[in-house]
Amino acid sequence: MEPGPDGPAASGPAAIREGWFRETCSLWPGQALSLQVEQLLHHRRSRYQDILVFRSKTYGNVLVLDGVIQCTERDEFSYQEMIANLPLCSHPNPRKVLIIGGGDGGVLREVVKHPSVESVVQCEIDEDVIQVSKKFLPGMAIGYSSSKLTLHVGDGFEFMKQNQDAFDVIITDSSDPMGPAESLFKESYYQLMKTALKEDGVLCCQGECQWLHLDLIKEMRQFCQSLFPVVAYAYCTIPTYPSGQIGFMLCSKNPSTNFQEPVQPLTQQQVAQMQLKYYNSDVHRAAFVLPEFARKALNDVS
């Protein structure tokens, strides 16, 4: 069963043929990623989406939502560490953090490591993803045991409407802009996050891939610049995401913020204590250095 030209990815066991999971999607037409499957571990349709977990030959357990890979045990750390530490290390004192999405627990795991973080609220609309992750991705879901966490199973939009001027950092760990997640890439969502942030607050959102979605990234950057005095785009590498890269849109309400230089640089001792495998202060700085085609597109340089 192949998706149509404008359709979603093939989901569930239908995406597994002859021992291989194959990811295709209209958001990255003309290309596919395949992983060899050792065992199908879980398949169920929740109220919101199709949830598939399989054990792969080389990437460990893999979580797939609506036919699109969300994380694998082998490479998830790069994305989780970056989407958490880029904003946290760009804020002078991030005590209260809000996570939208991130049901697999990876972002939460990284956020609660920070000693300055006193409380974390996570809004995840699909409780089934949380339960599946606790069972099949325990190394990611470990953060759910943190005493810093308040878990809110429900709509992040409604939660932020009721909690304004409340958070130092907001992190949105969303899936790709299809279906319900499409609204998380709109100006109205960023405006809502702005009102939920404190006066010097910082946000970081999943920002798609510069090789595939440059027009969308440019559009997002433009409306972010109309809302925030400081906006920056960064990226990291991750093998099982489309084209091997994923980006991050960062915004600050504080005009003196310099995302390219961490205000709280981690020492190598802290990196070791936090068991980081991708992020360090040099990687932080390098993440904002874009290839020329992306730099030109995002900065309107002719």
Swiss-Prot record:
GO biological process: cellular response to leukemia inhibitory factor; polyamine metabolic process; spermidine biosynthetic process
Class of enzymatic activity (EC top level): transferase
Record GO cellular component, one term: cytosol
PROSITE patterns: PABS_1, PABS_2
Residue numbers annotated as active site: 173
Record pathway: Amine and polyamine biosynthesis; spermidine biosynthesis; spermidine from putrescine: step 1/1
Molecular function in Gene Ontology: identical protein binding; protein homodimerization activity; spermidine synthase activity
Signal peptide (residue range): none
Annotated PABS domain residues: 18-253
Subunit field text: Homodimer or homotetramer.
HAMAP family to which the protein is assigned, alphabetical: Spermidine_synth
Similarity-based family: Belongs to the spermidine/spermine synthase family.
Protein task: Catalyzes the production of spermidine from putrescine and decarboxylated S-adenosylmethionine (dcSAM). Has a strong preference for putrescine as substrate, and has very low activity towards 1,3-diaminopropane. Has extremely low activity towards spermidine.
Name of the protein: Spermidine synthase
Annotated organism of origin: Homo sapiens (Human)
